[in-house]
Amino acid sequence: MKVTTEQLPKRIVALEIEPDAATIEKELNKAAQRIASKVAIPGFRKGKAPRFIVENYYGKAAILEEATDEIINVAFRAALEQENIKPVAQASLEKLEPEPFRFRILVPVEPEVILPDYKAITVDLTEEPVTDATLEVALDQAREKHVVLSAPEGEPEAAEGDQLTATVQTLVDGVPLHKLDEEDDDDDDDDDDDDDDDDDDDDDDDDDDDDDDDDDDDDDDDDDDDDDDDDDEGEPTTLIMEERRIVPELYAGLKGIKAGETREISAHLPADHPDARVADKDVVFKVTVSEIQNRQLPAWEELPGLEEFEGDLDAYKADLMERLVKNSGDHHRRNVLNQYLEEVVAATSFDVPDALIAERAHELLHEQVESLARYGINMEQYLQIVGKTHDEAVQELLPRGEESLKSSLVVRKIVEAEGLSVDESEINAEIERILNDFPDAQRGPARRRLEKELRPQVAGSLLDKKLQDRLVELATGNAAA
């Protein structure tokens, strides 16, 4: 067998393979036997006609066609072994010549990843401090979970602490925000249409008389539509009558409002408002209240019990502060890891087969759909919702797939470069630590699972922890030389 190799970009190895005569003859004989077993040839039982008889009936070309796939498979496997090539994705046949029998096949191989001097890369992120103000916010949030709503008697007026259900329309210079969006879209469309106006003018002249009659009929309908748009105040929303929760002018303007009442309240929104359409602008809020409810918050002393905490309020506050500090530290650690990996990936040299990127994008799509399974959404339904075919959905995820793959490759390279590993004693110790959290009656079955089918996951978790610890050391410049 003759094999020549050629290294192509994106880690593709092209193999030119010419199988030896013995391989071809062997597969031709098998192909003739398969054909003979499928058809009736006079004078022979099925599968018993010799090859030359089958050739006489069906021709050499039919036998070669039947044998081609197996010749390629056998020769390809032999060539991979001979050249010590390990595919990482499906190979593709590029060219096939029957006389003499030879073919060219493209094989994706292991990506090439050249790390930068990753030990010289550091990130400088300041951890947000957990203050008494942070604790106060968390306490308020915990207390809010247990608020009790009640309908007041009579015709109540909105007062401090009440909860309002209302529709709110925001107007800028008398124009609702949704109208501003439509005008922006229309401006864009007008720009696109300008180039076509000259071409359409002649046709429009011919149609003007007919259109005038139609337009007259539609005028009344259009007026009705405009009125509906102006009255469209959006979906009901919840407003809490506390000055720190809503715009001060809105808070003041809603005092004393009753259910069923509509008020227009002027306000000036700050320059740092998250919605650029209203930032540093005078606006009018058109508010229609549909319901007013009293809010009864639990007494502070009741909060520990409501949160199923064993201890008094001071102990609960101390525990909450401890959790806030831990969460803040974990969040900071994740940010450090993410930024460090982003910078290392950006400085790394990659040569990656497209097939691996597509494979990762395919995995991301299926992970995305699996996360929706609890809502009863399967792949077919998901694709209908997004209006895409499976291939289109994968194509859309290629950039994320490439980013995810490169990050994984960098992590794997760093694990190798740092010599990170876990031994059996570490795995056993981790299993014992996990078992301590189980009741005595459940430890036996849990141990069997952990020591057998879950052992690889325990090892992977330990290695991941070591890796994260090392990456944080590297990222913060605290790694030992």
Curated annotation (Swiss-Prot):
Keywords of this entry: Cell cycle, Cell division, Chaperone, Cytoplasm, Isomerase, Rotamase
Principal localisation: cytoplasm
Gene3D superfamilies, A to Z: 3.10.50.40, Trigger factor ribosome-binding domain, Trigger factor, C-terminal domain
GO molecular function: peptidyl-prolyl cis-trans isomerase activity; protein folding chaperone; ribosome binding
Disulfide partners: none
Keyword Cell cycle: yes
Start-end of Acidic residues biased regions: 182-235
Pfam families associated with the record: Trigger_C, Trigger_N
Reactions accelerated catalytically: [protein]-peptidylproline (omega=180) = [protein]-peptidylproline (omega=0)
Annotated ranges, domain PPIase FKBP-type: 161-298
GO terms classed as biological process: 'de novo' cotranslational protein folding; cell division; chaperone-mediated protein folding; protein transport; protein unfolding
E.C. number(s) listed in UniProt: 5.2.1.8
GO cellular component: cytoplasm
PANTHER family reported in the protein's UniProt record: TRIGGER FACTOR CHAPERONE AND PEPTIDYL-PROLYL CIS/TRANS ISOMERASE (PTHR30560), TRIGGER FACTOR-LIKE PROTEIN TIG, CHLOROPLASTIC (PTHR30560:SF3)
UniProt comment concerning the protein's domains: Consists of 3 domains; the N-terminus binds the ribosome, the middle domain has PPIase activity, while the C-terminus has intrinsic chaperone activity on its own.
Similarity-based family: Belongs to the FKBP-type PPIase family. Tig subfamily.
Function: Involved in protein export. Acts as a chaperone by maintaining the newly synthesized protein in an open conformation. Functions as a peptidyl-prolyl cis-trans isomerase.
The protein's name: Trigger factor
Organism encoding this protein: Herpetosiphon aurantiacus (strain ATCC 23779 / DSM 785 / 114-95)
